[in-house]
Amino acid sequence: MAAAAGNRASSSGFPGARATSPEAGGGGGALKASSAPAAAAGLLREAGSGGRERADWRRRQLRKVRSVELDQLPEQPLFLAASPPASSTSPSPEPADAAGSGTGFQPVAVPPPHGAASRGGAHLTESVAAPDSGASSPAAAEPGEKRAPAAEPSPAAAPAGREMENKETLKGLHKMDDRPEERMIREKLKATCMPAWKHEWLERRNRRGPVVVKPIPVKGDGSEMNHLAAESPGEVQASAASPASKGRRSPSPGNSPSGRTVKSESPGVRRKRVSPVPFQSGRITPPRRAPSPDGFSPYSPEETNRRVNKVMRARLYLLQQIGPNSFLIGGDSPDNKYRVFIGPQNCSCARGTFCIHLLFVMLRVFQLEPSDPMLWRKTLKNFEVESLFQKYHSRRSSRIKAPSRNTIQKFVSRMSNSHTLSSSSTSTSSSENSIKDEEEQMCPICLLGMLDEESLTVCEDGCRNKLHHHCMSIWAEECRRNREPLICPLCRSKWRSHDFYSHELSSPVDSPSSLRAAQQQTVQQQPLAGSRRNQESNFNLTHYGTQQIPPAYKDLAEPWIQVFGMELVGCLFSRNWNVREMALRRLSHDVSGALLLANGESTGNSGGSSGSSPSGGATSGSSQTSISGDVVEACCSVLSMVCADPVYKVYVAALKTLRAMLVYTPCHSLAERIKLQRLLQPVVDTILVKCADANSRTSQLSISTLLELCKGQAGELAVGREILKAGSIGIGGVDYVLNCILGNQTESNNWQELLGRLCLIDRLLLEFPAEFYPHIVSTDVSQAEPVEIRYKKLLSLLTFALQSIDNSHSMVGKLSRRIYLSSARMVTTVPHVFSKLLEMLSVSSSTHFTRMRRRLMAIADEVEIAEAIQLGVEDTLDGQQDSFLQASVPNNYLETTENSSPECTVHLEKTGKGLCATKLSASSEDISERLASISVGPSSSTTTTTTTTEQPKPMVQTKGRPHSQCLNSSPLSHHSQLMFPALSTPSSSTPSVPAGTATDVSKHRLQGFIPCRIPSASPQTQRKFSLQFHRNCPENKDSDKLSPVFTQSRPLPSSNIHRPKPSRPTPGNTSKQGDPSKNSMTLDLNSSSKCDDSFGCSSNSSNAVIPSDETVFTPVEEKCRLDVNTELNSSIEDLLEASMPSSDTTVTFKSEVAVLSPEKAENDDTYKDDVNHNQKCKEKMEAEEEEALAIAMAMSASQDALPIVPQLQVENGEDIIIIQQDTPETLPGHTKAKQPYREDTEWLKGQQIGLGAFSSCYQAQDVGTGTLMAVKQVTYVRNTSSEQEEVVEALREEIRMMSHLNHPNIIRMLGATCEKSNYNLFIEWMAGGSVAHLLSKYGAFKESVVINYTEQLLRGLSYLHENQIIHRDVKGANLLIDSTGQRLRIADFGAAARLASKGTGAGEFQGQLLGTIAFMAPEVLRGQQYGRSCDVWSVGCAIIEMACAKPPWNAEKHSNHLALIFKIASATTAPSIPSHLSPGLRDVALRCLELQPQDRPPSRELLKHPVFRTTW
């Protein structure tokens, strides 16, 4: 019995059974039972009731704690319950051993904190014995399951418990006498010493399930397990199923015969000696700090999922960590970079909370789950931020370590099937390696998975990690822009691969044979090609790697590869648009070089260079022609595909390649022309589809490209234009483009092709009227061609448009009908053609055809030609060949009603020689002088011959559709034309065709006809031209007689020459209608004075104006002199005075594609001409500067009226400050209030918009008038009376000074009051806020905005300095912007700075001063004498602030204002200027930031700088 008891005690669950045995420590060998009889005897002697009571108390405490805390846990831990005691009369020792394990103490194995578990060391896991794998009883497996009461202790077991308690406490286990509350406090104290990342790590480890402790099996064959199963099959089966049911843990290696050590299930973590807390019931994570609030998504579940999915697909890239809590995120474009700040949870994109860049960081960089509440918190606490970055850095550092050893081990073990790895290593690879493998399969730049089919690259010398090839190219571009060597974004080791960041030229050996000679030749002909080729040759495609060509394009690309090489062609199919653009630039370079070489163009040593080259034979004879033909054919085939690219920059590059090909391609014979036309046909078809692109820039550029093609040899796409002595015959001009439009019959369901062709037709009719309306240009009247044949081009286009009138696509139908009606209006003076258009409408009886016919008849009635059409006037015109040149409108048509618009009829009557188009009433100079004062309004309707316009529809201002088509003519017509001077910008004009190339102009067409729709341009542009007219208006009576009747009050030049509706109505539309008697004007040009030179009669560039179906006419002022001081009467015009002209937004071929021609061989006289031309350059520049300054001063001379608040008005001579009644009489000299104006009564204070030293600024509203104001409240109360007097005096000075200032760029004051202890300064409301506020909200300004604001700032400072006022505090926070964003006003005239210098408390103004110090001049900070130049220095600092959205000197990084003062005061150089500024603006900033005050120019002189003149 004693032996049995001793054996039971030695093999029981008591931790003390092994702890007391010297052989039992740590090794886990077989227990020796030599002391078992003595131990059993001691236990029996001490048996009594005390053991049972103590066991009952412990049981109650455990049950109490469990009942409180078990329900709070996400999953219930496993308790190791013992089996019921067996009978002492067991037939064999083995059942006795099994029964011995079922003592009354029921030891509990509580999973320890994961941070405390490790592979070695004494702990609870070693001291608490349990059955083998799966034998633990799930005491808390189900929350609602009632626990079975613990087995009653046997009498033999109780003394054993007493003896255990009397011995020393076991290692790592508290005495059971400790109160649970004390242990709870002890654990909480321990938790406060644990870092936040440790909590997160423990919590993550805890999710994997509790630790199941494995004992040392008594026998290696597991017989004890079998007997336990026989004793309590229910419990054993349930406990064995519990770990498997959780699915969190892999089976323990303890079951294997080799597993002879007791190890916990938390591998790889150092073990701590932490006391187990049985009452915590598995709660491992100590109490945490409260998380941040607002952890819920502000969007609906659907919207939340949509945003998350969008972020997970977004093409965003993690460029680098730029601060402790911030990342730099980039897009596909190297210019799109954003700073994301974690903690404040904001982003520099300023797109509001939870922008895509912030979510990218949270979801893909930090790898939060979409359901994580931290994702949707507006701010994160410091410990949460630290936790996120800790995880992020641990993930990155795990990848930086050289190739994953666990991965290697896994492969080795898989291949060798060896069992050399320890059980802990195996479990590590099963749990941690899966995570690490997932990390290694993720690109560290885009944070997305890497697939096998994607193009990947690898860090060869460093971490050996794989990355996306595309992502690495973006990282390489970032390194290049920062002028840094290319390094691995993970391990920072130097990138060995030359796939990226390479600038060497490719070797000619690698190039295809047809281009090899061209590449070698162009190296030596750089002087010929000019700087453009020198720059463009510095790119290479090798760093993009070999791109895969899609299988569907293999056959198509085969001939391209033979000509251009696999490398270039492969890049054309890249998914990265940057690669495609670079490939096209390379293609343009190669094509132009090959064509130049084939044409024998070089610097003169081409023979020697080609002879020494490997492909020298390719430069002679027919081989050149074959090379040229192959290159052109392959290039056209490529362009037909790439011109359909949806990316705008790639499309521009394609058009540049088209131009490079055409200008270097000769075309001398008709056969060559036909071949070139055939090759270009697919390219033109692709561009035609682009004419209807949804992107307005793309559509405008496409139309402009085809118009350049229509210009033939006079356009930018002239064939052989850059070849010396080419003599190319051209490709056909308008006729060729017409053939492309009409040649391929597009299906009616392909609306893109139809709409693109119609858009081009619409513009063709405007740009080339002489091609489609022969009556516009006077041709030889003796020609015998019938009218219908002369109009065959127009009829073919209208037939094409007529087919689409009933199209189901609304835009196609509308545009077709508009083209038809517009053309019908143009031919009203030619009844033959007009009747033909009516006949064409008779082919169908559909609704649209019927309606169009009615509208044409209405037009005929309007111009009174309906009867002539019905009577068949074509057959009764007395055989006059030029009858269509006659006016077919009665004289009474010139009379206008009040609603009608002015018309103009120009009579060119016949003389004995016929139509006297070459004989004018005065010399051409006289006519030019007379017409100098006549400008073209948006709807002038003068035609070139005896032509009158129909009466247009009544003016509809609400639609804002003043369509006008002005046509710039060149001196190529054979007859002089009386038109108005052209006011179009240079981009809308066409160079005159030289006499030598006039033969290319078929049918005496005017090549220079360029219609210019005149939309509402900026008032700044308007004033420029009005001033020009003011200077050019002749001082004689004739000019008064010729005062412009059709002129708008503000001429509106623009190159915006497309027909769609303008964005806003022309300002002149709101003018009053002129007197009807003055709205008709007839210029009778019969005279005896002759002008026989047909080319000399029209010396000025002039305009023919073609009315459309929606033409709107605008009357004008009677006088051509404009008073600039009274001209501005609209706040919008005043605010837009310095904005960029609207024409800058128009995209044309010249602005986007055309480049300067290579330098031609200069004549010997060139140098002399240059010297003569530049002799008076200085005088000319000075005159221009004075003119610019005069314009600037004149433009800023007037401004809007200031709102009036009655209670703030004072009589003349009275003080501006009105003292309220309840204010003490301690402030003499102020005006007593006649009407009270008190806060919260007569005016209401709104939100705070600014905070100063002793002042605060609020939005306010006047109750009586509703006027919005800004009120600056300044308290004047100080500690001493002397200080208070100084403050009051300074405030009075500022208020009185502001009351006398009146300038458009100076803030204006509505009034001031003194109420109680405050001065209230009421100033005008500037809704845009300060420049600093806009910079913080929207980021740095574009350069055009910086120039606009800088100019207005200089105007305001110039006004202040002329009035002997120094601002001393010019900075972004004191520059206010109005609601339009166009008007800048200077505010805060230094009172705060003076107050701050009066001796205030330490640090009281540190924040305000810190913002001011960065803008202060060095001499001011040094305490030296200063003057107006200190404001000029601040202007330079403001330019830096506006250009890069942060103050100069990196002031935001200085927390100590004294250090910043010392830095500026001791500076020997100016603050750094952003490198992206243009040379002009950079020069202005450098002038402002001269260290010596005397070297800085005055603000008035700076206004003369050319950077401000270019915007006029």
UniProtKB/Swiss-Prot annotation:
Q: Which residues cross the membrane?
A: none
Write out the GO cellular component annotations. cytoplasm; cytosol; tight junction
**Biased composition annotated in UniProt, kind: Basic and acidic residues:** 162-181, 1032-1041
Residue ranges occupied by any Protein kinase domain in the UniProt entry? 1243-1508
Instruction: Tell me where in this chain the PTM Phosphoserine is found.
Output: 21, 35, 137, 154, 275, 292, 297, 300, 507, 531, 923, 1018, 1043
Which InterPro entries does the entry mention? ARM-like, ARM-type_fold, Kinase-like_dom_sf, MAP_kinase_kinase_kinase, Prot_kinase_dom, Protein_kinase_ATP_BS, Ser/Thr_kinase_AS, Znf_RING
What are the boundaries of the RING-type zinc fingers?
443-492
| Chemical reaction(s) catalysed | L-seryl-[protein] + ATP = O-phospho-L-seryl-[protein] + ADP + H(+); L-threonyl-[protein] + ATP = O-phospho-L-threonyl-[protein] + ADP + H(+); S-ubiquitinyl-[E2 ubiquitin-conjugating enzyme]-L-cysteine + [acceptor protein]-L-lysine = [E2 ubiquitin-conjugating enzyme]-L-cysteine + N(6)-ubiquitinyl-[acceptor protein]-L-lysine
Keywords linked to the UniProt accession: Acetylation, ATP-binding, Kinase, Magnesium, Metal-binding, Nucleotide-binding, Phosphoprotein, Serine/threonine-protein kinase, Transferase, Zinc, Zinc-finger
Q: How is its activity regulated?
A: Activated by autophosphorylation on Thr-1400 and Thr-1412 following oligomerization.
Functionally, this protein is described as follows: Component of a protein kinase signal transduction cascade. Activates the ERK and JNK kinase pathways by phosphorylation of MAP2K1 and MAP2K4. May phosphorylate the MAPK8/JNK1 kinase. Activates CHUK and IKBKB, the central protein kinases of the NF-kappa-B pathway.
Protein name, please? Mitogen-activated protein kinase kinase kinase 1
Q: Which organism is it from?
A: Homo sapiens (Human)
